[in-house]
Amino acid sequence: MLCCYDGLSAVRLIRAEHDITLMERATGTKSLEAMAVNGEDLEATQIICRVVCDLHKAPLPTGVPDLSETFAPLLSAASHPIFDACVTSARALLSDPAKVALHGDIHHENILESTRGWLAIDPKGRIGPPQYDFANLFLNPHTNTAFVLDPARMRNLANWISKTTGIDEICILHAAHAHAGLSACWNSNDPENQEYPLTAANLLHEILHS
């Protein structure tokens, strides 16, 4: 995926051999996580949006999994009121015909400051609707759960992302709701860690239906 981005708002891949990669360093002093929890959440979100919009300009790569494969665990999850609601949002997300080269794991720690500006690192690579790349912001910064699980902050995020990217707020919220359910599925054998995304999924469901 780094080759696909060719340095546009992403670190440059300098060399790759077998399982070893040499990448451009991004060693700025600012942190998007610190900005978000210290009164600059809007500014941090706008930076993330600009980076992601640049990433989505990349041509669609070959051999990259479709987002539907990522959601297979949720779509096949045992019936549960929360999961059932998240499945509905996942189907709404996956039915969107828009397709871009998704980073697949956008959060505050995966965009770093550099001499070239803010750059994304560690892409997972998927093909799917652009709103999915903003879904993980509704679970992050994960080190401050009280901050993240604030319904007012969730509403603000959807509004800020929509205004910056032009993506419909409801589409953004469906993506976030679906991703929270997926995250809960990934943690199905770890009840302690599952509680966090389940709580987020509940809150996002309430926002979607308010």
Language-model segment annotations:
Residues 1-16, 114-115, 200, 204-210:
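Conserved NTP-binding catalytic cores of kinases and kinase-like/nucleotidyltransferase enzymes
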Residues 1-22, 26, 30-55:
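A conserved alpha-helical element in kinase catalytic cores
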Residues 183-210:
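ATP/Mg2+ or Mg2+-diphosphate-binding catalytic cores
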Residues 114-159, 166, 174, 196-200, ...:
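Active-site Asp-x-Gly
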Residues 13, 87-132:
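Active-site acidic catalytic loop and adjacent metal/ATP-binding pocket
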